[in-house]
């Protein structure tokens, strides 16, 4: 179930301030954030935002097709290394 349209999209204030400050600065730096719940706005396009995945900050370059999605969607928290190999030959 999605968010109500009357509420509008959510973005943390501290993240929005960092993006606006970056817009005024001539050099682009990576913006670190722990806010996986924030929605990607059109003003974020072209910036690299490092999203925390519980262990490290994953750099995410914001592109046009990412607008409307959440930052956490692009920084997976779980690492899947596959199921154990089938060892039927070694059991005989």
UniProtKB/Swiss-Prot annotation:
One of its GO terms (biological process) is translation. The keyword Oxidoreductase does not apply. It comes from the Bacteria. Gene3D superfamilies: 30s Ribosomal Protein S19, Chain A. SUPFAM superfamilies: Ribosomal protein S19 (SSF54570). One of its GO terms (cellular component) is cytoplasm. GO terms for molecular function: rRNA binding; structural constituent of ribosome. Keywords: Ribonucleoprotein, Ribosomal protein, RNA-binding, rRNA-binding. Belongs to the universal ribosomal protein uS19 family. HAMAP family: Ribosomal_uS19. Protein S19 forms a complex with S13 that binds strongly to the 16S ribosomal RNA. This is Small ribosomal subunit protein uS19. It comes from Streptococcus uberis (strain ATCC BAA-854 / 0140J). The lineage of its organism: Bacteria, Bacillati, Bacillota, Bacilli, Lactobacillales. The gene is rpsS.
């Amino acid at each position: 179930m999605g968010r109500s349209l009357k509420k509008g999209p959510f973005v943390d204030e501290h993240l929005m301030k960092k993006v606006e400050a970056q817009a005024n600065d001539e050099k682009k730096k990576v913006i670190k954030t722990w806010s996986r719940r924030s929605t990607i706005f059109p003003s974020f396009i072209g910036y690299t935002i490092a999203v925390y995945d519980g262990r490290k900050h994953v750099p995410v370059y914001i592109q046009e097709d990412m607008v409307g999605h959440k930052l956490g969607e692009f920084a997976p928290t779980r690492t899947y290394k596959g199921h154990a190999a089938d060892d039927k030959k070694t059991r005989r």
